[in-house]
Amino acid sequence: PVIGDFHADMEFGTGVVKITPAHDPNDFEVGNRHNLERICVMNPDATMNENALEFNGLDRYVAREKVVERLKEDNLLIKIKEITHNVGFSERTDVMVEPYLSKQWFVKMRPLADRVLEVQKTNNKVNFVPKRFEKILLHWMEITYDWCISRQLWWGHRIPAWYKGDEVYVGMEAPKEEGWVQDVDVLDTWFSSALWPFSTLGWPDNMDSRYFPNDVLVTGYDIIPFWVCRMVFQSLHFTDNIPFKDCLIHGLIRDKQGRKMSKSLGNGVDPMDVIEEYGADSLRFFLTTNTAPGMDLRYDEEKVKSTWNFINKLWNASRFVLINMEDFKKEDYTLDNLNDQDKWILTKLNQTIKEVRKSMDKYDFNIVGNTLYSFIWNDFCDKYIELSKFNQNNTTKSVLLKVLTDILKMMHPFMPFVTEEIYSMLPIKESESIMISSYPVYNKKEIYKEEKENIDNILEFITSFRNKKAELNVGSDFQVISYIQNKENESLIFNMLKLNDKICDENKEINSEIVEYNGLRIDILYDNSKNLEEEKENLQKEKENLLNSISRREKLLSNVNYVNKAPANIVEAERNNLQKEKDQLKIVENKLSNM
C-alpha cells in the first residue's frame, strides 16, 4: 500500500520512502499508526529467510547487492547516490547491527508513569537541584512507552521466566517440575539498578527505615531518563514511597576547550594518572568545588595543581600548630583570656561555619569551596598564624587547635585522606576518626564584632604600610615615627612589620611618607637620593611597555574582522586588559611627574 505519514521528509530525495516495520524502529512506529503487517525477512544469524523469496538463504550483505542487480536488470534503478546515514555498529565486534523483531519482556509503563506525575504534584515529591531538571523527569513520564527489559547479554540478572512448550511460568523461584527451561535473556541493567535505593536495605523483608527514603542522589543530567525516572517509579510501585528526597544533578566533565571527552578526539583524562601526580584529594576538591549544580565542568590541570598547592598550605599550617603543641595536654586547653586576634579568628571561623552550612544545605559546593579556601589561606594561614607567633600561651594554642579541628571537619567531605591523616595527629580530639566526629556548629557567642573590626583595621594598615614601602623601594634602609596611641595595637603592628629597631626621633630631618588608615599612623623616614634615578628609569621602561601594549591592543580591536569573528569572551577580555593598561599608565605617569 501507499500511505501518507509525517515521518517522510519531503525535502529529502523524492519524499517517498519504503518502510519495513519489522526491521527499523521508526518504520515500526509508522506501521503501528497504520496497522501494517510486520514481515520479518531475516533469520537470527542475519541471513535472509523464506519471506525474502529468491534471496532466501543469502547473507544480508550479499542479498543487498543482489537486490541492486535485480533493479538494474528490470530497468527500475534511476541512480545510485552516497548519503550520510546513522548506522549502528556493535561496540565489541564492529559489525553492523540489524534491527530484528522478536519476542521480549516489557514493563507496562503508563500506570507507573502516571503515579510519578501525581507524586510530583505533592509535597512528598523528589526535589531536583537545580529545579529545572525536574522537567526532564516529567517530560519522559508524559511521553513514556512500554519499556523493553530483555537484554541479550551474558552478564546480568536472569529473566525470572521459564518455558515448557507453550507454557510460561514467571516467579521468584524456579518451577519444581522437570522440563522447564529458563529464559536465556537478562534484565536491562537500568531495571536492576533502579531497585538499588531499597533492595540494598533488606527489601522486601525488614527494610531499614533509617535510610529510606535516601537523603540525596547525586548523578549526571544525561542519565535522568535511564536511571532517575526508573528509580522513582520502581520505588513508588514496590515501597509506596519516593526513593530519595533530593536529586542533585551535576554536569559533564569536558576538556579545557569545552569539548566532550571522547576516544575519537583523544582528549580523555585518566583519573589514575592525575591521582598519581597530584593525589586523590586534589582531584576530588577540584571536581566538587569548581562548578555550580547542573553545570558542565572544564577539566583544567592547572586548577588541580592549584588545589595541590592549597593542600600543601593546609599541611604546613597544621605542622606549625602541631609543633607548637608537642607538650600540650587536655587540661591545658582553655578559651579564657582571649586577646583581640583570638577573638578575630573565632569570629571569622563562625562566620565561615555559618556560610558553609548554609551552602552545604543548598548543595552549593562551589560556594563552600571558595569560602573555605579564602578562610584557610587568607585568614588562618596568612594572618592568624602570623599573629599567633607573638603570643604563644595556652589560650592561643587552644584557639589554634580549635580552628584547625573545625577546618579539618569542614574540609573532610572534599579532602578525606589529608584531613583524616592530620586529624589523627591532633593532641586532643573527640573521636578516633574524623568521619564519626560532629560537624562544626555556628556559635553566636563567639562573634566579637568590636575586636574583629579592630584587627581588620590593623591588618588593612599593615597592608597599606607594605604597599607604601614597596612603592618607595626603600628596602630595609628606613626609620619610622609612630603616632599609634593604643600600645597593644602598636606592639602588634611593630611585631608584624618588624619595626622594633627602626624607631627614631620625631625631629629628625629627612624625607618622609605618611601611612595612615582609620586612626592609625606611622611616618616612614628615608633617604631617596640613592633610589630616585633607578626608580625613574624603571618607571620609564614600564611606561614604554604599556604604550606598546596599548597600541597593539587598540590596533587589534579596531580590526572589524577580528571583533566579528573572534569569540565574544576573547574580545571582551582584550577590552578589559586595554582599560587596565590605560589605568596603569596614568598611575605611572603621575609617579613620574611627582618625582
What are these regions (language model features)?
Residues 32-39, 69-79, 174-181, 201-212, ...:
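Secondary-structure transition/capping motifs at alpha-helix termini
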Residues 52, 160, 216, 302-307, ...:
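Short secondary-structure subsegments characteristic of cysteine-rich extracellular domains
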Residues 140-191, 195, 374, 404, ...:
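Gly/Pro-rich turn-and-neighbor structural signature
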Residues 144, 190-194, 224, 231, ...:
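Short alpha-helical scaffolding segments that buttress acidic/His motifs in well-ordered protein cores
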